[in-house]
Amino acid sequence: MSFIKPIYQDINSILIGQKVKRPKSGTLSGHAAGEPFEKLVYKFLKENLSDLTFKQYEYLNDLFMKKPAIIGHEARYKLFNSPTLLFLLSRGKAATENWSIENLFEEKQNDTADILLVKDQFYELLDVKTRNISKSAQAPNIISAYKLAQTCAKMIDNKEFDLFDINYLEVDWELNGEDLVCVSTSFAELFKSEPSELYINWAAAMQIQFHVRDLDQGFNGTREEWAKSYLKHFVTQAEQRAISMIDKFVKPFKKYIL
């Protein structure tokens, strides 16, 4: 289930032609270029799905503010009612322990989701990716392959297959003078991709990388089948990587220490 998908064409219509100023610092392929477009998406969703739409840190602040008598990280963690969502959305023990009205969470670049949509105990985690289509560039980091493996394991252990989606919106832009101009968008659902085709870049902090517009959406199995298929893919890739690392970095030097 996606709250975004039914209104995606509206989002697409609003975004195409939108201009944001070229960042004064940072690279055009980095966070500085993407953040203004992400803010436009958030603004649209906040205006049209106001009761559902949060930044991840806003949701956590709201969750804890509704239960001010609950203190301590262990008690606050129980508010999630889901080990998988706790893993995906929560902050660390110290930060959760020290949270207060005077010490609210702030946005972190490594939050799992740029935008979180919540309704009837279902969560849609949305990440906004941007792409300079004037240049051929490596696909962006999407999510840690290890973090996704841990997520799949928790889904299976706790039989939590219908609580959340992880989806992506790509904003394609071109540089026009001092402006970045949106020329197209794409939307894709992680759990509709073929797990065995996800590219893991082990040299880039084990990140799964893809362009949203290129992500296959042909998987027709259950969420449990997706999780198990991904774990098989991850383990196979990890085993191959381990063999490669030993062959390259261990075997040539072992004779010197034996």
UniProtKB/Swiss-Prot annotation:
What's the superkingdom here? Bacteria
* Listed GO MF terms: DNA binding; type II site-specific deoxyribonuclease activity
Under Enzyme Commission nomenclature, its number is: 3.1.21.4
Enumerate the Pfam families for this protein. Endonuc-HincII
Record-annotated membrane-spanning stretches: none
**What positions belong to coiled-coil segments?**
none
Which InterPro entries does this entry report, sorted A to Z?
Answer: DNA_rep_MutH/T2_RE_sf, Restrct_endonuc-II-like, Restrct_endonuc_II_HincII
Reaction(s) catalysed by this chain, per the record, are: Endonucleolytic cleavage of DNA to give specific double-stranded fragments with terminal 5'-phosphates
Which EC class is this protein assigned?
Answer: hydrolase
Tell me which Gene Ontology terms the entry assigns under biological process: DNA restriction-modification system
Q: Which UniProt keywords apply?
A: Endonuclease, Hydrolase, Nuclease, Restriction system
This protein's name: Type II restriction enzyme HindII
Q: Which organism is it from?
A: Haemophilus influenzae (strain ATCC 51907 / DSM 11121 / KW20 / Rd)
Q: What does the organism's lineage look like at the top?
A: Bacteria, Pseudomonadati, Pseudomonadota, Gammaproteobacteria, Pasteurellales
Gene this protein is translated from? hindIIR
